């Protein structure tokens, strides 16, 4: 045919190829080639002039080849262009000439189809109206249906391009479209399908101009809705669904919206009436239509013997119209009455075959029931597509509806032999398609297979349709014993076996059957199940996953070995592909408690690559790539460097601190007794453990780059060096894991006053611009109830009180922890290091425990679910969903609702936090007042004790002076030098070899924070004693850790800070030196007096120091019990 196209016009001068016989080899450009092709087609269609030789291809012979010629011409690309205008002009003239003749009208339409699609814009605008008139003339003739079909196809393209040009759009709308619709309505019955195609094109591209004929069009469509031809019925339904958009609408399409809703309610009312007529008496509790719709006036044929068939066909057409109205696009936002549509669907699907009588026309009604259910399921799918995830409030109804339909159509499915199609497979396929669509739209929120009776029923049906049929061999008993028991009685002679022809059965290998039987329902069930597992897998129960593993893995191996094939649905490549897809879904979305079958899946996919079907083998290759990415990732995963001790349970990732997020709850582990506390080894703990007296610190701490959660800080955030935990500011509390002490050293004892009675110390805020001795500013604005102890350098720490029982559990703070660095050790300006030592982040908040002071933190309610009850209800009607609205309107509405909900939640959270803080601060103020009263009483007692001790010392000194000066005064004056004054940092002289002096730290300040209320919790007998001590600097701690066995350096004298207030230690020392200058006379008296005076001096110094510190920070000292001997602090 191509040779005929190129050689048919060799005689014409315009069609000749320049360059002689070079042919296409002489053509250098594509446009030139298309021009030659156009001229060749023109030469084929028109006779040669000026020649007596007859044409090689007469026009009547070239007409059958013309559609093929047009298609071949389109293969070469667009024929439009400035260089082809002359050839296109020749084709336009030729097309108009052919359209005017009845015999050549089909050829003219073929040329016109090429010109409409390939002509440039200028040529199209010039000839569009004339072409439209020519087509209208063709529609008014009595041409054959093939010519009418081609004319309507050209009309559709003509209207599509004309709607893009405003001038042509206005001209055709006002002057030509009503006449065109009238011509289409007047076509004869055998051309009804072409007429519907033309009307659909007019309503699609020119909806406003069709408004004048809306009534006539509606009647025409309704008369064809119940047509017996499926194509004609589908076209009529599509045209009827476009009726609400016809005509001119007001602003924002209000009139169109009202028309759409009116048509929808009319369809619902008519469908309810038809369903009642079809199954009158078969419904247990029929739902009456209460909508505003008016029933349609459908044509009725009197004397029709098949009334039920006509009603069924009409029901099918109106249900399709309703589904198309829901699923097709509409120009204005509309409201869908979801509850009314679901009521109709449930009413239709509740008609069961068990309730239909088998007398009269009952069998015919039963015969029609599966098709009625199919239409209802199609309508449900259209509703899901139209409303999407906004149907979640009806999710329970939908999840119950699907297994109900499967139960009603599972009768007699197990009694058939393999190779036969099971009954009602089409209905079950439609149910599984709806399941897949519902899960695809709503995801894990669909709630499918997540427990309940409906989920178990659905899973049972899915597994039954997926499992291949098994060949059942029925063993028949001997003829003499119907029950199969052996015959007893007198033995008889053996008889010869006779061949029973009636019992001769064909072997199972030679059986008539369909190899693709049940493949559709099996593929649909596999597809729906794999989609459900992929979207809802982690939420499905572990038992369901195990059941699927037990079914799928042997089935895959049987398919690969050829054992399952034969008469099973897995002979179809589509079912095998969906089976592999289900296996991949089980691998990608496993249950948290059931490991995925990774090794078996890898083997199965590897063997699946050898499948004969390219579709199956290519899917297995893709699945292997996915599995390889899971098992061997190209980038190593981020594994946090946690502590060396194993964690007993997986810990969720830490969340950023937020004032609206409650701290994670960790249940407190059991508190072991002090005696049974392990001294070494890992001790996993689920939460902070309250301390009971001095707990030996056996902590194997995380590295210096780990935070308090055991995660690597460098992998999370870049923390400045000052905030990194270091040994000089990180104290192991009772809520931390134990570590081993340095080599050979006993575990140091942490007094409970350092842990503040077992509580986690609250951070104190220290603000400084430069680390200098004179620039320390202490700010306690956020923790006004805390107390701070500043201990001068060199002062020995007060010994801890003996442990007396377990302390009460720690109380959770009412608010979120505030991140603030602790106070670093104060250093001299000349020894200030270039990089300050790292500091630890604030400790995590302890878990909330039940107690009188514990306040529940505010919880953040997720958006869209107030109170966690369910999805938000609509303001006006819960059963109406707006669809087809613009994205901007929906986003503005959703943003407005979300902002209002967030503001309400934030106000509630802030109100709760303010109430909690007010209650907390009121309690703290009461405790402070009680402490002030106790402090005043203790201060008075301290002053009285000091006066009594001063009087006793003066009396003792007077007695000593009288004794000394009375007996040997001159010897004393001429004797040796006076005894040296004991410095305050030295231990008592009673046992100098037992007590080792502490290493002298650099000058610094120690901040210890104690929450008031600890004394009330401990009671009067176990009140915590403040143990002030000086923190060592970083360098000294490193030296101590590096050489723990090394001896302590010699103590240095305490230097007075220029910015610190003058202490009373030096004055007391000087007074003590003046008073104890004379040496004793006798050794016994001397020793007794020295011991007495040393003890009194030490007690007084400690009491004075405590009083001075209490005056400085208004913190009452605890002097109710005499302090035990000083112990060395590690």
UniProtKB/Swiss-Prot annotation:
Keywords: Acetylation, Activator, Cytoplasm, Nucleus, Phosphoprotein, Repeat, Repressor, Transcription, Ubl conjugation. The modification Phosphoserine is found at residues 13, 477, 481, 1033, 1043. A motif (LXXLL motif 1) lies at residues 33-37. A motif (LXXLL motif 11) lies at residues 584-588. Residues 774-786, 886-964, 1083-1104 have a biased composition (Acidic residues). The modification Phosphothreonine is found at residues 488, 745. Coactivator of estrogen receptor-mediated transcription and a corepressor of other nuclear hormone receptors and sequence-specific transcription factors. Plays a role in estrogen receptor (ER) genomic activity when present in the nuclear compartment by activating the ER target genes in a hormonal stimulation dependent manner. Can facilitate ER non-genomic signaling via SRC and PI3K interaction in the cytosol. Plays a role in E2-mediated cell cycle progression by interacting with RB1. May have important functional implications in ER/growth factor cross-talk. This is Proline-, glutamic acid- and leucine-rich protein 1. It comes from Macaca mulatta (Rhesus macaque). The gene is PELP1.
